[in-house]
């Protein structure tokens, strides 16, 4: 509040003396700021002038609550790509804040204030505003654990002696990857991003196809004692409800993959299956990168 009053007085003084108010910068929040207790949280802005991004600025910010006095919180922002500036700041509580920015370039300083409502996050990341939660991460961890158990049981049936020992040692080393948050997030973002692309292309979820895929998974899992035991411990109804939701996205993605295979065959009718599938996979990865870049993804 004090910062806003001081800025108003400075602007009034400029008007009275006929001085220029300096560059006409506009600040847009490109990544929202959320509150987590005892943790500095990331945020990002874009600075514009006449609808063009402004590069080469030195940017600092001071946050203060709009309606209460809980002191101020300062941060220095680092320049990124295309006129973006990012930083981390630890706030005392959620609520309405005034963010007073100081933007400096060529020795000239400009001050701008924006108001924002800082809320508690509903998850650990979001894609176009749709949250990825810790529960989502836990489910993906469990799915990966099931796959490890399948590989372990399969190895015991397939190998003997030293070869079995080496395979089991390798699988044991993979267990630490189960808790890799970045890998789990990447899996979720890849799946959900491409499912969103499928919907954008007009594809729909066919419940019959989903149930068909679920039955295939049930048949596979039923062959492994350790997998059945883990699912029972997780809660069978809970597991299959989540798995069914997962396969709604997978069925959508399969339609995109079929489109790409059909296009690859059309582009090169003399190509063999291996070449067609390779070309389709390359196109899929290109589409994935393009889709992810087009989405507003926030990772906390």
Question: Predicted regions span which residues?
Answer:
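A C-terminal, polar beta->alpha supersecondary segment
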Residues: 247-300
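Beta-strand-rich structural segments
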Residues: 33, 37-53
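Residue-level recognition of secondary-structure-to-loop junctions
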Residues: 79, 91-93
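Aromatic sugar-binding surface patches on proteins
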Residues: 79-86
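C-terminal motif of bacterial Sec signal peptides marking the signal peptidase cleavage site
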Residues: 15-18
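Short flexible loop/turn segments that cap and initiate beta-strands
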Residues: 49-63, 68-74
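Bacterial signal peptide processing site
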Residues: 20-22
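N-terminal targeting/tethering segments
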Residues: 121-234
């Amino acid at each position: 509040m004090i910062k806003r009053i001081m800025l108003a007085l400075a602007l009034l003084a400029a008007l009275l003396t006929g001085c220029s108010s300096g560059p006409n910068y506009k600040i847009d929040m490109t990544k929202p700021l959320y509150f987590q207790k005892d943790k500095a949280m990331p945020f990002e802005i874009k600075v514009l002038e006449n609808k063009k991004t402004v590069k080469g600025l030195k940017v600092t910010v001071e946050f203060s609550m709009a309606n209460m006095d809980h002191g101020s919180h300062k941060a220095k922002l680092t320049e990124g790509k295309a006129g973006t500036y990012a930083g981390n700041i630890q706030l005392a509580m959620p609520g309405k804040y005034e963010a007073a920015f100081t933007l400096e370039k060529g020795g000239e300083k400009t001050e701008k204030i924006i108001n924002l409502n800082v809320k508690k996050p509903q998850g650990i990341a979001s894609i176009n505003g749709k949250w990825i939660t810790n529960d989502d991460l836990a489910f993906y961890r469990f799915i990966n654990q099931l796959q490890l158990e399948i590989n372990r049981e399969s190895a015991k049936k397939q190998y003997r002696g030293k070869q079995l020992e080496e395979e089991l040692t390798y699988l044991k080393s993979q267990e630490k990857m189960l808790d890799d948050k970045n890998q789990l997030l990447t899996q979720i973002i890849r799946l959900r991003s491409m499912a969103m692309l499928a919907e954008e292309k007009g594809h729909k979820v066919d419940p019959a196809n989903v149930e068909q895929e679920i039955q295939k998974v049930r048949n596979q899992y039923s062959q492994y004692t350790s997998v059945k035991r883990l699912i029972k411990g997780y809660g069978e109804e809970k597991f299959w409800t989540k798995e069914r939701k997962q396969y709604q996205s997978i069925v959508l993605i399969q339609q995109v993959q079929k489109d790409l295979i059909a296009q690859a065959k059309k582009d090169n009718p003399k190509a063999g299956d291996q070449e067609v599938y390779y070309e389709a996979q390359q196109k899929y990865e290109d589409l994935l990168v393009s889709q992810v870049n087009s989405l507003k993804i926030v990772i906390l």
